[in-house]
Amino acid sequence: MRMFLFLLLVQFVSTASASRTDSILTILDSELGKKMEYRMEKEKQISTLKQSLFVASSVYEQYFICDKLYNEYSSYQFDSAYVYAQKSIEKAELLKNDELMESAKSNLLFCFISAGLFKDAIDVMQEINTSRMSIRQKQIFYDQMSRLYSELARENMKEPYHRKYVNLCQAYCDSALLILPEGSYEYNNVLALKTYTNPDIPSEKKIAFYERITDP
């Protein structure tokens, strides 16, 4: 979480005091030090899941293993995450299960956002029916949409497009915050994005907010 929030607010570090900058960079160094250990553990889990997928007999079981593989890859290897998101869609089609299909589409949406394929992401978004989603799936979807519009706002600085995308980002953040447990990992991530993308909040306050929610 700290790594994510650091990257979200890093452009404001130059406006902070030297002590604040040192504090934030110390957190980043700590997170980078854990990267190799984290990746090795991920690869071990992925290998086990692939073996399970190879021997899985039911389509339901195959779907959920593909979904788990997507989740394992989604944090660091987006092309592989895309492969298993697509496989999940194929399994959901065979099962004719609307809720599983919406979840798989949401996974595909994440892959397109992560790859910067925003047009493809919008196309997938327009196919998603949130009325078929569980609360948990809606939490994930609203979070993804807030990030999509955050990226579009960053890519389109000209008005009226920039303000339009900022407003949509803020609106999806609000939707996510309404159904996320307050103070949770996901809640703080969305709140950080809402704070970061709000043009009315000075950079000093954004950095102070970052320090507050990452304080152990």
Task: Report the location of each language-model feature.
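Sec-dependent N-terminal signal peptides
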Residues: 3-12
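A "functional boundary" signal
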Residues: 14-216
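Short, Lys/Arg-enriched, disordered terminal segments
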Residues: 1-4, 19
